[in-house]
Structure formats: C-alpha cells, structure tokens
Amino acid sequence: MGSLTTAPDWYLMRGSGVVALLLLTAVVVLGVGTTKRWRPARTPRFVTLALHRSISLLAVCFLAIHIVTALIDPYAAVRLLQVVVPLPLGPYPFWLGLGALSLDAIAALVATSLLRHRLSLRTWKTVHWLGYASWPLAFAHGLGMGSDSSTVWFLALAGASAGAVALAVGTRLLGARRPYPKYLGTALETGGPA
C-alpha cells in the first residue's frame, strides 16, 4: 500500500474482492447443485433456485463494490476500459485481464438470466456454461493480483473455494445427465419438473 491511497479504499477493495470470490464460489456450487437437484428432502427446488439467484445478486453487488473502489483508488490505477477489456496496461496487465474476462462472462450470465423467459433453453444453458469459465478466471485474478494472495488466511479460503468447486463440478461431470424442458419459463419458477 502506498501513500497515494487511503486505507478505507484499499481495505474495501480487497475485502469486497475476497467476499465476491467466496460468493461466486457459492453461486457455482449451488448452480451445479440445482442441475443435480441437490437439496434437503423437504426443501422444494424453487427454494434452492431462489438461494442461487439471491447469492448471485449479492456476489454481483460485492463485485461492483470491488470494481468501483479499484477505479477510485489512485494506488490501484485501474482505468474503466481495463475493467471490461483485457488491455496490456498498468503493472499487472495479465491478472487484471483475467478479472476483465471474468467480469465479461458474469455480465453475459446476468443478462441472459434476466432475459431467460425470452430465450430458448439451449441459448440460456449455453451462455450459463460461462459460469464454469468465469469462476476460475476470477480465482486466478485474485491469486495473481490480490495483495493478500500469499497470506495463510487467503490461501486457506482459496483452497476451500477451489475444493468446493472441484468437488461440485467433478460430481456434475461424472453424474448422469437429466433432460430439461424445452423452455425454462414456469418450470424454474415453480420448482416443477425440469
């Protein structure tokens, strides 16, 4: 941390980035869980889906805080264009570029989720596969760019996050595929057969 930055900006940027990564981990695990229909026996599917959506919204909020504080912090020196386009600028262009690519994937996920009632299942599902790409990009961004990436507490959180996602995705990829309805519409909203 340099003299050009204020401690609250710096800590808010770091903290919101870590919280966003943890929430994105939960979103991926819950997303995989909804495709596998993981849930307690007495919990309707729409509850699991609502939790997935709610945590997704919270993750996007913390991601927005992370981005805004990075933009206003003079020490971070992040430009607006760098947030969405991986550019070879600044001291860590590769790691910042991974964050930009992750944000782009997350933006596509949010947009298609908001428009899911107007999209075919195939389109929505194809774009939703970006979730599997956005998480490792965000994870690598945090490991490479984060000022806490060499601390024991961060490495423990990162290891737990990686383990949770690897277990969920591994289970998803090794499990049997289930058919989906032609259109998402009411099946996802009501917890009906999907």
Pin down the residues of each PLM region.
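Membrane-embedded alpha-helical bundles that constitute the cytochrome b-like, heme-associated redox core
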Residues: 1-194
